């Protein structure tokens, strides 16, 4: 059966990218076969969970195509440790207990720059960052085991630094003696230049090479800087060979960083590469809700949707908008509303709503309620038409720049007082009827996205 599994792996390899195959399928080994139960070995709980969720049907199909049997597949976490990256027993720090206290304390405060707010608990996980989040947790739980180095890449403001520091905070919380270094590549370079100037390179090298965990942010800034890359290369090798964990972030995939030396690029590809994509609208709303709770800001759902629907995918920019609204509300003693948000943020937010027309809203609402647009615009008083009409008018007022008279004209020439009545009617119903509120918010979300 082991030969069958090797052949199944070979077939799976043909349909996956090399990185995906090497990360998830290649480490799996045949264990036992009992009747219709096939047990495969995986090197970690993380791989077990990820493969079960993402690749189990593919594995079942690959094996059944060779054996004509659909086995019940189970994964067993093996106690074996991959030869490529052996962890130190019990993750023992570099410093020994019997060393002098003066030496023990040297450079320990290097972890002081780990922002305590950046934890896994405060990180909002969504489809766009699920892989990077899971990989970071796996590294933090078992440093220098299966994913060394860990390379996280993605655009500006998507959470790379948050995950990087969360790894450090988690390890620090569970191992007080662990020596953790978090540096930006720019800080690494500046410190190296300083030490070169004052002939303290031995001190510089010892400082980094005595670390248990090295966290380097924005590695792309080393590109084109030969001396810095040379020094980092030797630091990387020293730590890797000592089975110390290395985590690096970048705004690009290693191969896409111009000016990055091939020897560094290849080393980054030794471990696991995880990307963070721009968050979808649901994740952005979840982030805003989490941040508003942490900052004791009352953020209405429609305002959260408005912020999340802005053109930006930069999480830091979203947080900045939230803090700005919270500060204004606090200083003026007012509640945050959609109109306030539009006014306060008009200089920085780009609304997608500018592209939404009354006609688009009419068509979308009519399709949702399974009526004709002509019926939506008519004067028919049946509830079947009145409620959708009022909802459509309300959304037109929310998502377009059209005035009451302009909206009335698009709804069969209705008087502006009728339009105002419809808007107020839906506002009142949304405050008292959760079903109506959900319908309106979902329709708005569908139109915006």
Curated annotation (Swiss-Prot):
Cross-referenced Pfam families: Bac_DnaA, Bac_DnaA_C, DnaA_N
SMART domains in the record: AAA, Bac_DnaA_C
A single BP term in Gene Ontology: DNA replication initiation
Annotated stretches, region: Domain III, AAA+ region: 113-329
Positions that bind ATP: 157, 159-161
Family of the protein in this entry: Belongs to the DnaA family.
The record's note on its domains: Domain I is involved in oligomerization and binding regulators, domain II is flexibile and of varying length in different bacteria, domain III forms the AAA+ region, while domain IV binds dsDNA.
Protein name: Chromosomal replication initiator protein DnaA
Organism: Geotalea uraniireducens (strain Rf4) (Geobacter uraniireducens)
Upper classification of the organism: Bacteria, Pseudomonadati, Thermodesulfobacteriota, Desulfuromonadia, Geobacterales
Gene (UniProt): dnaA
